[in-house]
Amino acid sequence: MAVVSADKQKVWNCYTMPEHITKWNFADPRWHCPSATNDLKVGGRYFARMEAKDGSFGFDFEAIYSEIFEGEHFTYAFGGRVAHVTFKDLKGKTEVCVMFDPETENPIALQRQGWQAILDNFKNYTETT
């Protein structure tokens, strides 16, 4: 969860528009997100390429939207798992909360840390854009 010092519409736009996603969607400063697409509709596809800046490793994150309530929340499925993202107005600030199904290969604490690091990058980017 992160509380972003920006109105909900700006936060929603920065979270869902590909030209913004590529600026914040990575957990470590040694990584980046060189490309992203987002078809924000039920059945639409979210895609983000994440890779190490030195080119040593990379992966594609793909998800399909199952629920969207514009400006409020969305749910998408990826690799047999689901994530739900909510946006709550806090009088000029916006709370963003990401709930996700963990995968089985890595400890849950490590997964939470990674998702939170990406959310922290998002907060920093949105507040300075």
Predicted regions span which residues?
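Intrinsic-disorder/low-complexity, polar/charged segments enriched in Ser/Thr/Lys/Arg/Asp/Glu/Gln
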Residues: M1, K8, C33, R45, ...
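A short, amphipathic edge element
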Residues: F26-S35, G80-V82
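Beta-strand/loop substructures that line and gate deep hydrophobic ligand-binding cavities in soluble
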Residues: E72-I118, F122-N124
